[in-house]
């Protein structure tokens, strides 16, 4: 699996999909002692996902997030991968490979580009683009900045990312440091769009992924009128990019 299929950053924004809440009190990520919820989907299957709307989901204390209300999304799956944790980290740092990811738009009944631009940054400054992050940077725990532009927004957003590797268990945290805007209107303030991504090797050749994302307010207005299936397909496209698994979109 090449690095192009392993970056996962846009999950922080694009998996915030209105798929309906559930009766559980909230997600259980791998950082908790309880069994993960949602549980990991089998390899080759669509990842399990759950969405909690305002005031429904309880934020896990182990995330370190504040208990502000908003939308909370969890996604969990397994994928086959013969590389190492370092290989995955290199893929995560390959920000430029996010550009051009495509998804099936149920609203427009056709394939569309999901991310129109993406690049690593020297700091929280759009005027300081740089090459993709090196492995030494990914394993240092340093603050790493990148920017990406969603096809529905058209304006770049700057994110801060930090990664850690504990015995092959990867944890990547991401949050926006610039506001999310459209047509000069601020939709989400800095720090109100956060995600944590957990990757661990279940057994040789088999990895688990658990992603958790929250936003102070759902960003649905940013995209205008879009069918629910299109949001789901965005998440599926990003998961396919990460894992290399061919997952059929919802049509």
Task: List each model region and its residues.
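Hydrophobic/aromatic beta-strand elements that line small-molecule binding cavities or substrate pockets
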Residues: 158-165, 194-201
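A short, solvent-exposed beta-edge/loop patch
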Residues: 195-226
